Every structure is written in C-alpha cells, then in structure tokens.
Amino acid sequence: MTAWRDTLGRIGVRAMPGAGGFWRWWQQSLLAWLPQRWQWQLGLSQSRLLLQLDGEALQLLRQRDQTSDTVASLPWPVQPQEVNALLPTALEGLPQHWLLPASHALRRPLRLPAAAAARLQDVARFEIDRQTPFTADQVYFDARVLDVREDGQLDAELVVVPRRMIDGPAGVPEAWSNALSGIDVADARGAPLGVNLLPPARRLRRSDPMQRWNLLLAVAALVLLAVAGWLLLDNRRQAADDLRAQVQANAGRARQVAAERQQLLELVEGAAFFQEQRATRPTSVEIWDELSRRLPSGTYLEKFSVEGGQLQLIGLSKEASSLVRRLEGSPLWHTPSLTGVLQSDAGRNVDRFTITAELAGPDAKEAADAAQR
C-alpha cells in the first residue's frame, strides 16, 4: 500500500470507527474513474511486482488491488539485474516484493482497541511473546487490520515468520535481499496477505512516483505565494501612492482655500478698518453744513477737498482775513490756517484764499453730533 493510501487508511480507522467498509468503498469508487497507469503515477494505486519461486521458475506477478496477473516466468536462478532488464517500461518503477508460501508463516488473530491502529507495529511486537512460541528477535513480523467492529475495536492479524525461513537457504536468496521493497506471505489460496515482513531499514526505497509531483506542487505553491505576495505588496504600494496623491491634492486645495480665506479676511478687515476710519471722521454733508453756518455771505468756494484727514478750502471772499477766526472752534476740525497769502481781485473787490484744517477725531465728532441734537 502506498504512503497516501496508508495515511488515508489510518485516518479512516481513527476518524471514523465502524465506517472502514464505507471508506474503502468510497476510495475504490473514486479510483475506478482513473486509468491504472494514472493511479500508479499519482501514487494512488496498490500496484506492485510480486516474485514467487515455483519449483525451478521465478514467477513475476503484477498485483493491482486484489487481482494478480502473471507478467513472466523466468528459469531459476536469475539475478535482479536480469529481471529488471526484462521488465516493460510501465513496470520498472513498481516496488518488488518477495512472496513466501503460506507454510512459512504463523498467523494469529488479534482484537485490539481502536487506539492501537496508530501504533499497530508496537502492539504486534508486544503480542509476539504471548501469541507465538518465538520472541520478537527471532522472527520477522507484521500486522494488518482486517475490520473495524461496531463497538470501535479492531479485528487484526499478526503474521510472523522465523528469521531462518527468510535468511536461510529456503528463504530469500542473498542476491535478492538488497533488491526488495518488501516480503509478503501468501494465504491458503495463494493470494498475498498484503503485509511487509521486511524491516524498514532493509527495504529498497524506489523513486516515489509522487516525488516529482510533490516537487512541482511545492515549486508552484512557492511561485503562487511569491506572486500573491508581490501582487499584495504592489496593491498596497499602489493604494499608498493613491492615498499620497489624494492627500497632496487635498492639501493643495486646503492651502488654496486657506489662502482665499486669509485674503477674504484681510479684505473684510480692511473694509472694516476703512469703515471705522470713515465712522470716526465727519462726513462731507456734516462739513458742508458746518461751513454754511460759519462762512460769511460773499464767500465762494472753488474747491472743497477732504484727503487723509485734512480739509482744504480754496475760494473767494470779501472777508478773507476773518475766515480763519470764523472757522476756529468747530468740533469737526481744528487748527484752521491760511496757506500762502491772500490775492486781491480788484475788479470784484474780493480776495482769493486757501485754508487748510485737520479734521477732528471721533470724540470731537460725537460732541458735534450731541451739539446738533
């Protein structure tokens, strides 16, 4: 039995007590869909090559599951190299097992708990002293599970062959001792029991048909893992780049909004400042009203200007020399004064004047408003 099928068998015994028949039926049903050659190449077949001495001839049998077909009959003696040279290509990789006659073996039935399936060889070694007249060092042995009872116990069988029956002249020839993957025993009808009496250390390890598949699967898994990791890393890198670009775009818009907000704030503050400045200065209407009350008759203005908190009056008056005195004491301005000299206009009997004054601050404006009220 191959490693895969051994593993599946152990799982079937331990994981599903009482369902061994169903497990075997399910396996066989699945395998029936695959050609025999594929079953062997995938490591799912029980195919092996049996070698059995029959008088003066060596019978070569190919066992597949429970059936055996004669491959060749070679005159004895024959060397392993000669047999391998005669084998077809499809049979070269099959494990070779020597088949002993039923008379060489001693078989004893065993009833074991289900937990014993995991350590069947150790349990069988312990049972040798109890079930046979030999010790474990005097025999080659193996055990096989026959059935799983409804109560979970195992029906097993212990198979032992004295060492002299294998190592002696009537056993396996010395030339074949290092060329075998196992030693099996035939039952009363000549069918192999399916045991392997050869110790694991002496079994020939042929190339595992699944080794190449396992290697390819491992390489494929590594490649897929590397590709998945690279794709994940590239995806995360792309996501990071997109996030960085989005942050930069948002930062640019945020800076633009902040700049526009600052500009708007400055405009609002500037407008508020100018509004405040205008509120603290007398208006043109108020200045005109004040001038109309203070300027005497016969006075004409050619220019009226308010710039930077300074009032400038240019005009003609018959009483130009008294204008400064008349303008003094107003709550809307202070320190009125003539700029330059008076220029006489003899034809009209008036003098040209230029007067400047500083507009008053908010306190004076409030006083003027109160006086008007």
Swiss-Prot record:
Annotated Pfam families:
PilN
Is Cytoplasm among the key words of this record? Answer: no
Any Gene Ontology CC annotation: plasma membrane
Q: Which residues lie on this side of the membrane: Cytoplasmic?
A: 1-214
Q: Where, subcellularly, is it found?
A: Cell inner membrane
What keywords does the record list, in alphabetical order?
Cell inner membrane, Cell membrane, Membrane, Protein transport, Transmembrane, Transmembrane helix, Transport
The portions of this protein that span the membrane are 215-233
Report the record's Gene Ontology biological process terms: protein transport
> Which superkingdom, per the lineage?
Bacteria
Q: Extract the InterPro entries matched here.
A: ATPase_NBD, Extracell_DNA_Util/SecSys_Comp, PilN
Residue ranges, Periplasmic side: 234-373
| Protein biosynthesis keyword on record | no
Q: How does it sit in the membrane?
A: Single-pass membrane protein
What the record says about family reads:
Belongs to the GSP L family.
Describe the task this protein carries out: Inner membrane component of the type II secretion system required for the energy-dependent secretion of extracellular factors such as proteases and toxins from the periplasm. Plays a role in the complex assembly and recruits XpsM resulting in a stable complex in the inner membrane. Provides thus a link between the energy-providing XpsE protein in the cytoplasm and the rest of the T2SS machinery.
Oligomer status and interactors = Type II secretion system is composed of four main components: the outer membrane complex, the inner membrane complex, the cytoplasmic secretion ATPase and the periplasm-spanning pseudopilus. Forms homodimers. Interacts with XpsM/GspM. Interacts with XpsE/GspE and XpsF/GspF.
What protein name applies here? Type II secretion system protein L
